[in-house]
A protein has these predicted regions:
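Small-residue-rich segments of transmembrane alpha-helices in multi-pass membrane proteins
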Residues: 496-503
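Acyl activation and transfer enzymes in specialized metabolism, enriched
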Residues: 37-56, 114-130, 200-236, 384-386, ...
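Short alpha-helical packing/oligomerization segments
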Residues: 449-479
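Juxtamembrane boundary at the C-terminal end of a transmembrane helix
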Residues: 504-514
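Membrane-associated alpha-helix detector
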Residues: 422-458
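Non-catalytic, low-complexity flexible loops and terminal extensions
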Residues: 2-13, 107, 119-127, 131-210, ...
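Acyl-thioester-dependent acyl-group transfer interface
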Residues: 1-68, 77-103, 233-424
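Cytoplasmic-side transmembrane-helix entry/capping segments in multi-pass membrane proteins
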Residues: 488-496
């Protein structure tokens, strides 16, 4: 099928490190969902997804590993709707597995759109979900004569897959020489693998807007200040002199015209060093000032060019990915030292007035290795999605207490996610026991083979082959369980490695031809 899109394209600048830093503890997946006022019909949702994919074939891509960079390759794989069974933000990108980088699922009244961040950002995901919900409701209610979202006709396929980072990059823009301080790090026992603690809070847009206006700030500034103060009460004593710092993603389309559906975002870092005398007003004024200083086109261009300058460096481009990946991972880890948590405000979701009869609210939250808050609003309801690797929800409670103190009406949403919660964790513990038992058996078999070999022959000869077989079997199972990697590829690498070792052994021990 000819979609008019490129058969392959390189990852945009913001996505370059995502495949490398994706792991069992942070999947780099975010969930955008729509809560309807009626139960979702899976067959109609599949038909709606088929229609939506005709408008967004850009998303019909798999992630491949090249010699120098990762890239996206178009594949004619049908996106299939599934009932929700996995925990939120479960892993979508699995190395060596040629699968789509997003998943549409449903549960009761909820339509979920989960996407790996290398494919698109929050703005791209929002447009896709808007289109999907529109197509679903039009099919589900043909008699309602619901209007369709209007699209600018002049937007081309090339516009949607454009790498806007490269378009607006300029080597003449000066470098950002600002040094970042190490920020407060939240302490506590973390959940393992893709498990995370999810809390959602719905609040009145009118109330939060009234409060922000009375303070002379935007809603984003107000919520950022409240988030900083909520974390303040949980600062470990040995980190009291460090700043509490939030990463705030910035939609670069607001500063540089772009219709791209790929990632096109930057970020600013907003922080505060607390003392015993600090008041909420002090934090609010500081945050407002930092936003005004950072959200200037010239400074944003400086940050953006800094990201791209590294990618464009001839030496970096010439280094193979297998070597480059270690430096990218180190860079990502060093960058996270100046961040305590993340706050991402997607903004207002707009649909024609006729759709309000069927939609309750929209929500968004993301996988994290620490703490993240996301927000979006529809009508008079803003939903805050907190995700945390630390099951203690004291920061979330602090935030809700502050909302009450500021007379902002709110309520905690009691969502039930299939595959999430204590039952899911117990199942994982049982799986862990099975894996531990298998590991013990592999070791025990190898030891028993060694004992039998020594008792019968007085030396260890065939034991080495039995031990290698046990090690290979253990490695295959571990890769399949923990990394969900390609088992056949793993076997091929093992065969190649064993063959090389055997040849070298034969060569340097004088044994010929075995």
């Amino acid at each position: 099928m000819d979609t008019g899109y490129s058969k392959w394209r390189k990852l945009d600048n913001a996505a370059l490190a995502f495949p490398l830093v994706t792991g069992k503890n942070d999947t780099r997946v975010f969930r955008f969902y729509c809560q309807l006022k009626e139960e979702v019909n899976g067959e109609i949702l599949q038909a709606a997804l088929d229609q939506t994919m005709e408008k967004y074939p850009l998303f019909q891509a798999v992630l491949r590993k090249g010699l120098f960079w990762f890239y996206l390759e178009h594949r004619d794989i049908r996106a299939v709707v599934k009932p929700e069974t996995e925990p939120p933000c479960s892993r979508l990108y699995i190395p060596d597995k040629k699968s789509l980088l997003f998943q549409v699922s449903y549960d009761k009244n909820r339509i979920n759109f989960e996407v790996f961040h290398a494919l698109t950002d929050g703005t791209g995901a929002m447009h896709f979900l808007q289109e999907l919900v529109q197509d679903y409701l039009i099919l589900a209610h043909p008699q309602a004569d619901l209007p369709q979202i209007e699209h600018a006709e002049e937007i081309t396929h090339g516009d949607k897959e454009e790498d806007s980072f490269s378009q607006y990059y300029s080597s003449d823009i000066p470098k950002d020489k600002e040094k970042k301080k190490a920020a407060v790090k939240l302490k506590g026992e973390k959940l393992v693998h893709s498990d995370m603690h999810v809390t959602e809070v719905a609040l009145s847009v009118k109330d939060i807007h009234r409060k922000a206006r009375s303070c002379g700030v935007s809603i984003t500034v107000l919520l950022t200040a409240m988030m900083l103060c909520s974390i303040r009460e949980e600062i470990p004593k040995n980190q009291q002199k460090r700043p509490v710092a939030l990463m705030i993603p910035v939609n670069l389309r607001n500063y540089f015209p772009s219709q791209s559906m790929t990632n096109f975002f930057g970020w600013i870092e907003v922080g505060y060093i607390f003392s015993d005398e600090t008041t909420f007003e002090d934090v609010l004024l500081s945050v407002k000032k930092q936003f005004e200083e950072e959200l200037v086109k010239e400074k944003i261009a400086m940050h953006m060019s800094g990201y791209v300058r590294i990618e464009k460096n001839p030496f970096v481009r010439a280094v193979p990915l297998e070597i480059k990946k270690y430096f990218l991972m180190i860079g990502a880890n060093l960058g996270s030292r100046s961040i305590t948590a993340v706050y991402s405000n997607i903004g207002i979701i707009r649909l024609p007035e006729e759709y309000k009869e069927y939609i309750q609210h929209f929500g968004i939250f993301a996988s994290t290795n620490s703490l993240q808050m996301c927000s979006c609003s529809y009508g008079d309801e803003m939903v805050l999605g907190f995700t945390s690797k630390i099951p203690n929800d004291s920061i979330q409670r602090n935030f809700q207490r502050m909302l009450g103190e500021e007379n902002v009406s709110h309520r905690e949403l009691k969502n039930e996610f299939p595959g999430y919660g204590e039952k899911h964790r117990l199942e994982k513990k049982e799986n862990q026991k099975v894996i531990q038992t298998f590991s013990f058996l592999c070791l025990a078999i190898a030891v028993i083979c060694g004992m039998i070999n020594f008792m019968m022959a007085g030396v260890l000869n065939w034991f080495w082959f039995a031990g290698a077989g046990c090690a290979c079997a253990w490695l295959v199972v571990m890769v399949a369980y923990y990394k969900r990697g390609n088992i056949l590829k793993n076997e091929m690498w093992q065969l190649l490695l064993i063959s090389v070792i055997a040849i070298l052994w034969d060569r340097f021990t004088g044994w010929k031809g075995w």
